[in-house]
Each structure stands twice: as structure tokens, then as C-alpha cells.
A protein has these predicted regions:
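Multi-pass alpha-helical transmembrane bundle typical of ion/small-solute transporters
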Residues: 1-223
Length: 223
């Protein structure tokens, strides 16, 4: 029991480290344009991002549930706590390496791949929850394509609408909207990325028999 508790505490600690790294790795993307155009000061933008990420993390828990049960089956995991600990450390290392070399990367890709890889190394391919894992992989692949298409379409629409607009007035209005979009992006980041650590901690609690396995909802202290 002491071993289980120590590993579980380590997973919680490394999950918080992962969240911190994810913050300076990804959160800046939400406020970068608003700061660069001086729509927001750096201090205000950081405060806005922190508040909206926090609200987003508490609003929805769907992503946390996906991390908990859709990648691997927690009931089939042997040495499950070691698997989860190895996965979170691997994701942290990869995020740090890509940040150090200035390589754009996704914390989601890193964490999901790390969980799957650690589980397969420990127990083979049978431990994967193939229906859920396949769904996640498909979404990860098509997300950049969908974002590219939406970005192209939105730029074209905005260009047509503001083709003959007064440049000074348009810039002033765009700065106002950038405050809104920065807040919305930060909120979205909270509803997605902030929940990944919740999912990891919940998975660890279930594997350690510290949480009812029929409930994959993160408990309040995890949120």
C-alpha cells in the first residue's frame, strides 16, 4: 500500500509539472497575436489566459474521461501505476525537448502516444482500447486539415468584407475582437489541454483502487 501511495503521489506531482510545461508551451499561442498587435499588454494577457483556462478546465470533463478510459483499458493494466508514471514523464521530456529546440508540437499527441507506448511496452497491443484509440488518432490527424480549411475560408471572408474599409478604424475594431478571441482561445485550451492531467490522475486513482472504477469523472480535488 505504501508503494502504491508513493507512485500515485509521484503521478500527481508529474501531472502538475506536465500542466505547467503545457502552459508555457501552448497557452502563449492563445494570447500571442493579441500581445503582438498591442490589443492587450503582456501582463493583462497572461492574467486573462490564466482566468479563462481555469474556467474552461472546470466547465467540461469530456477530455479527461477520454484520457482515462479510451486509450487503454484500466482494468487490464498490470503494473498500471508504473505505466502511467512512465507515460507522463515521457510526455514531459518530449515537450521540453521540442520547446528547447523551438519545434512546434502538440502536448496532446505527446501524452496520448506516451500512454499507448508505455502500455504496449508493459503488456502488449491487447491492452489498447482500439475503438477509442482509433477515434482519437483519426481526430489528431484530421484536426490540422480542418483547421487549415477553416482558416483559409475565414481569411477569404474577412478579406472580402473589409476590402474597402478604413484601415485605422478596421485595426481598432480588430484589436477589440482580438481581446475576445484571446479569451475564447484560452477558455478552449482549458476545456481541452488542462483536462489531460485530470484524466491521467483519475486513471492513476482507478488503477490504484483509490477511486470507484465505475466513475471516470475527475473528483473535485483533481479539478
Amino acid at each position: 500500500m505504501e508503494y502504491v501511495l508513493v507512485i500515485t503521489i509521484a503521478i500527481v506531482a508529474f501531472s502538475l509539472v506536465f500542466d505547467f510545461i503545457n502552459g508555457f508551451h501552448d497557452t502563449a499561442n492563445a494570447i500571442a497575436t493579441a500581445v503582438s498587435t498591442r490589443a492587450l499588454t503582456p501582463r493583462t494577457a497572461i492574467l486573462l489566459a490564466a482566468i479563462m483556462n481555469f474556467i474552461g478546465a472546470l466547465t467540461f470533463t469530456g477530455v479527461a474521461g477520454t484520457i482515462t478510459k479510451d486509450i487503454v483499458d484500466p482494468f487490464k493494466l498490470q503494473n498500471g501505476l508504473v505505466v502511467v508514471l512512465a507515460a507522463i514523464i515521457a510526455a514531459i521530456v518530449w515537450n521540453l525537448v521540442t520547446w528547447l529546440y523551438g519545434i512546434p508540437s502538440s502536448s496532446s499527441h505527446a501524452l496520448i502516444g506516451a500512454i499507448a507506448g508505455a502500455a504496449i511496452a508493459a503488456q502488449g497491443f491487447t491492452v489498447l482500447h482500439y475503438q477509442g484509440f482509433t477515434k482519437i488518432i483519426i481526430v489528431l490527424i484530421i484536426s490540422p486539415i480542418i483547421a487549415f480549411c477553416v482558416g483559409f475560408i475565414m481569411y477569404t471572408i474577412v478579406k472580402i468584407i473589409f476590402k474597402n474599409a478604413n484601415l485605422t478604424r478596421a485595426n481598432r475594431n480588430f484589436r477589440f475582437f482580438q481581446m475576445f478571441t484571446a479569451a475564447l482561445q484560452s477558455f478552449s485550451h482549458g476545456t481541452n489541454d488542462a483536462q489531460k492531467s485530470m484524466g491521467i490522475i483519475t486513471l492513476a486513482l482507478i488503477v490504484a483502487n483509490l477511486q470507484d472504477p465505475s466513475n471516470v469523472e475527475p473528483v473535485l480535488w483533481v479539478k
